[in-house]
Amino acid sequence: MDNRNTQMYTEGRIKVPGTQPSPGLRITIKRAGVEPTIPGVSQVMFPDASEVGSRKQLSSASGGPEKGPRYRDTFKEGPSELRTQEQRPPAKPGKKQSSWVPQEGSQELQAGQDQSELGLLPSWVPEGPEGLQQLGSGKEIEGQQRRQRNRGTGEDEPPESCQGPGYQSTLGHQADVVQPAEPCCPLAGRGQPLGDKRPKEADVPHIRPQEAPPEPSPGAHGDSSQEAMPPTSTVAPEEKTASSFLPSMPGPTKTKGGGEAVETQPAPGPLPPPEVRDIGERREPDRVQQQPQKPVVAAGTQNLRKFRQGFMKCLLEMEKVEASHRRALKARSLTAQKSPRTLTPVPTSSPSLPQTPASAPASGPSWARLSAPGPEPAPVGASVPTSTPCPVLLCPALDLGWRRMELSHHSSERTLSYAKARQEPEEQSLQKLYQNREKSEEQLTLKQEEAFRSYFEIFNGPGEVDAQSLKNILLLMGFSVTPAQVEDALMSADVNGDGHVDFKDFLAVMTDTRRFFCSVEQNALTDMAPHNPHTLLFEILPLLVEMLALPEAVLEEITNYYQKKLKAGTCKAQEMEAAIGRLRLQKQLPYNPQQEESSEVPERKVLSILSRLKQQNYAPNLQSPYAQVPCIPLCPRMDKKMVRRKPTNHYVQDQCTTPGLAPDIRSPFFQSRSQGNREHNSDSRKWPSSVPSRTH
């Protein structure tokens, strides 16, 4: 047990027998005043030369290592690849620097293990036989052969005895490839005997000729001598490529002292590439080892970013479609309000969704593709695969939005139908009025009908008014019209649409009230107005009357007919204008009869209201100034400004009275409140008897 402890401490480890190293543990001790360690750069704290010399003397004199944390305090964690390049300060002049020639077998083995741990095969392989020739004992040769066999199987696997603070690495993210170690076997990695081996680090400091040691930061030297390193297990960077995916095969090995040590041998694997073993390439292992993880994280973030971009793109497309449909619906409602008779039904089918992005797979949920027939739609809470960035869960919400819009459109249709229902009685009344007028127009007497037939025969056509006969009459009356205007007049006169203007069509045109009033307005406006094809026959008739081209009885019948029509038409026109005005008001503003009454109140109604108020308030409220009759009828010479001004106090009231008024007239209207009720009552009794005599 003493030999094991001695070998453990001399090997520069901080392993306590009986404790099992935790493979994923990485301990970095930070204190105030200590500068942070840059990844890939190791800081090794060394004591003074005198302190190192004293410790070496103590260790060589006692034949064993120093006990306790003093020896361990001089080391600090650092990457294992930089420990091979460190150069320790020279010892005192009396001390001899260590060389590759071993003082004892354990020193050479330790140096070999250090070199094999760092993967420096090109520098060590040729030197291996020379070191073996210098060994004096067969036991040491046997240990070297055993070590070479182990190196041949996995030369990059560091021994368990070297897994201490001297070989501590800051690669915390490689804890998953740490090889398991048995708790009580410090020298089991190479099967070395536990007996006569003296430590190399405890005796003479090992020289690292390639690089000078970094200067420790101020304050770090004092703190490094007081820190105790907990047990931890690390792996050299070479194990990442050689044994990260190969399990170790532990096996029992008999040592010289009779103890049984577990030998951990990795499975044979390919050698690491030379650029990994290169010292210049391994100065920043954290960056090199973090590179495989960055693409994975970048790929994950890129996928998430693509998913978010696809989601936002679909969301914006949904919003654009919804806004466009909303604008179309608004325009449709505006057109429906302008022309309520031409309402178009709302399509009940839901609108087609926009095309999904190219990243989304073609096989999506059936309810996402509304146009294509398929199985029943999935529920709202159905799970969607994470690899599809198409936001299919937004479709039910969009459907709900369309339902709301349909409901709003239906509500607008209801309001329009209600307004239309209110307008229908007025329109029906107008239609009835037109029908009654047409019935009255159709009811012609025999004399009136004979008079219009005689006018029809003037055109001298073959039983109808044709283009040639109409053109001849127009030329006779002095009208200059084009053939196109003649054709338009004939087409307008063809009421039944058979292509011929017979007497029935001619009679319907001449008895049409609208055409008659249109011709009257056209003649009243200006004589230079262009000829209207719809009223061309009415324009010819007055000229015939002036020329006395018709018999006197015919002219009298036609003249009387149109005079009655004009008189009845003016009254009906007024009624029509009033009805049309009411319709326009109902379309713009709701009809309120009380508002119309309040806007136009007749004078008699105002007087009746005043008399009613006077009768109600005269008896109980005689003292109130508002119940008293004003002095306007009794004072015709009073100034208008005085009358309009409201009397506020007795001084103003006295000024308002003219000096011509008698005191008995002034007293009942401008009496002070300080007078008694008796005097007021006596004066008020005198007023009704005097008013009728003066007003009549």
Curated annotation (Swiss-Prot):
<feature type="compositionally biased region" description="Polar residues">
    <location>
        <begin position="96"/>
        <end position="116"/>
    </location>
</feature>
<dbReference type="GO" id="GO:0005509">
    <property type="term" value="F:calcium ion binding"/>
</dbReference>
<feature type="compositionally biased region" description="Low complexity">
    <location>
        <begin position="339"/>
        <end position="366"/>
    </location>
</feature>
<feature type="binding site">
    <location>
        <position position="498"/>
    </location>
    <ligand>
        <name>Ca(2+)</name>
    </ligand>
</feature>
<feature type="binding site">
    <location>
        <position position="505"/>
    </location>
    <ligand>
        <name>Ca(2+)</name>
    </ligand>
</feature>
<feature type="compositionally biased region" description="Low complexity">
    <location>
        <begin position="288"/>
        <end position="297"/>
    </location>
</feature>
<feature type="region of interest" description="Disordered">
    <location>
        <begin position="646"/>
        <end position="696"/>
    </location>
</feature>
<feature type="binding site">
    <location>
        <position position="496"/>
    </location>
    <ligand>
        <name>Ca(2+)</name>
    </ligand>
</feature>
<feature type="domain" description="EF-hand">
    <location>
        <begin position="481"/>
        <end position="516"/>
    </location>
</feature>
<dbReference type="InterPro" id="IPR018247">
    <property type="entry name" value="EF_Hand_1_Ca_BS"/>
</dbReference>
<dbReference type="InterPro" id="IPR043520">
    <property type="entry name" value="SPT21"/>
</dbReference>
<feature type="compositionally biased region" description="Basic and acidic residues">
    <location>
        <begin position="275"/>
        <end position="287"/>
    </location>
</feature>
<keyword id="KW-0479">Metal-binding</keyword>
<feature type="compositionally biased region" description="Basic and acidic residues">
    <location>
        <begin position="67"/>
        <end position="86"/>
    </location>
</feature>
<feature type="region of interest" description="Disordered">
    <location>
        <begin position="329"/>
        <end position="386"/>
    </location>
</feature>
<feature type="binding site">
    <location>
        <position position="500"/>
    </location>
    <ligand>
        <name>Ca(2+)</name>
    </ligand>
</feature>
<feature type="compositionally biased region" description="Basic and acidic residues">
    <location>
        <begin position="676"/>
        <end position="686"/>
    </location>
</feature>
<feature type="region of interest" description="Disordered">
    <location>
        <begin position="1"/>
        <end position="301"/>
    </location>
</feature>
<protein>
    <recommendedName>
        <fullName>Spermatogenesis-associated protein 21</fullName>
    </recommendedName>
</protein>
<dbReference type="InterPro" id="IPR011992">
    <property type="entry name" value="EF-hand-dom_pair"/>
</dbReference>
<keyword id="KW-0175">Coiled coil</keyword>
<feature type="binding site">
    <location>
        <position position="494"/>
    </location>
    <ligand>
        <name>Ca(2+)</name>
    </ligand>
</feature>
<comment type="function">
    <text>Involved in the differentiation of haploid spermatids.</text>
</comment>
<dbReference type="InterPro" id="IPR002048">
    <property type="entry name" value="EF_hand_dom"/>
</dbReference>
<keyword id="KW-0106">Calcium</keyword>
<feature type="compositionally biased region" description="Basic and acidic residues">
    <location>
        <begin position="195"/>
        <end position="209"/>
    </location>
</feature>
<feature type="coiled-coil region">
    <location>
        <begin position="424"/>
        <end position="451"/>
    </location>
</feature>
<feature type="compositionally biased region" description="Polar residues">
    <location>
        <begin position="223"/>
        <end position="235"/>
    </location>
</feature>
